[in-house]
């Protein structure tokens, strides 16, 4: 994946970061989140902080989708395998991408593959990526792909083709047993994501984050609207709760959990549906059942 500095140069990358800083500050203020700490902690220290945070918030387990490379994340997961799982995250178009995915899963114990679509150098439906999809299907792991806008307002996209979830249509149709999970309800591409889900039953929707992108739509859209439409169309079996938690002192974003449970309860769904969305579907994807 091409970094902002590699694509735009250091000066312009700095401008992009400064432009998005206000949006990020507004977002933290709205949710009552502290500013990310700048102190450096070892992986071992961070792992213990996560366990303490999960205990405090009564959370059984978390899945990390990035963590300083596949080997490093696997090391962290092994510190607390009863509390942590993790996904591979590496260049989709690297010469050994398929082999690295196989190693990450079979040797390192990671349980899925994470991609940032709009950060890719090439189109996500490029045929050169097909060996990776074939490997993921063979390994029976989920693939989590972030489409749509990145970060807070002002976050640049590096490949406009890859912003749209519909760019995955041919890939998802070509590998019907491979589970694709699209986070943040499509991040400004909710309509397109529903169209992809209509055509490809192997595509699931992840609810993660603040979903602040709703404020940037040309029509009113609420979290309740998103859940209602997803339940009406794809059904509870294809909806996966997530938080997009990352830094401390925030830790696990329980504010997102509370808000999403509140909105789902307000719809009046049954307890079994709530269980599917907030635990069972993810457990099934990660092979944690039983």
Question: Predicted segment positions?
Answer:
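Catalytic pocket-lining loop regions of alpha/beta-barrel enzymes
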Residues: 111-112, 125-240
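Active-site gating/metal-coordination segments in enzymes
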Residues: 60-61, 65-163
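Conserved, mostly hydrophobic/aromatic
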Residues: 54, 73, 104, 113, ...
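Short, surface-exposed connector motifs at secondary-structure boundaries
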Residues: 55-61, 81-85, 173-180
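Generic structural signal for well-ordered alpha-helices
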Residues: 48-51, 70-77, 101-102, 129, ...
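Mid-to-C-terminal alpha-helical segments outside catalytic/metal-binding sites
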Residues: 2-57, 61, 103, 229, ...
């Amino acid at each position: 994946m091409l970094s902002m500095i590699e694509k735009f140069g250091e000066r312009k990358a700095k401008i992009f970061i400064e432009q998005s800083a206000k949006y990020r500050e507004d977002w933290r203020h709205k949710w009552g989140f502290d500013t990310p700490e700048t102190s450096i902690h070892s992986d071992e220290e961070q792992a213990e902080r996560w366990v303490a945070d999960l205990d405090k918030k009564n959370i059984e387990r978390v899945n990390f989708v990035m963590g300083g490379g596949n080997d490093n994340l696997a090391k962290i997961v092994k510190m607390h395998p009863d509390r942590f799982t993790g996904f591979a995250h590496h260049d989709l178009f690297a010469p050994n991408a398929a082999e690295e995915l196989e190693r990450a899963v079979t040797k390192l114990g990671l349980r899925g593959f994470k991609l940032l679509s709009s950060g890719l150098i090439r189109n996500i439906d490029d045929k050169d990526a097909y060996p990776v999809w074939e490997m993921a299907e063979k390994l029976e792991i989920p693939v989590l792909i972030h489409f749509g806008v990145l970060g807070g307002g002002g976050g640049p996209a590096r490949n406009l083709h890859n912003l749209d979830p519909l760019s995955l249509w041919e890939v998802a149709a070509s590998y019907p047993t491979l589970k694709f999970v699209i986070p943040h309800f499509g991040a400004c591409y909710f309509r397109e994501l529903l169209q992809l889900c209509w055509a490809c039953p192997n595509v699931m929707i992840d609810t993660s984050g603040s979903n602040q992108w709703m404020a940037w739509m040309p029509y009113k859209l609420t979290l309740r609207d998103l859940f209602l439409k997803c339940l009406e169309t794809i059904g509870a079996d294809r909806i996966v709760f997530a938080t997009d938690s990352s830094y401390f002192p925030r830790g696990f974003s329980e504010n997102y959990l509370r808000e999403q449970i509140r909105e789902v309860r307000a719809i009046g769904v049954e307890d079994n549906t709530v269980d599917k969305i907030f635990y069972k579907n993810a457990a099934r994807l990660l092979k944690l059942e039983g």
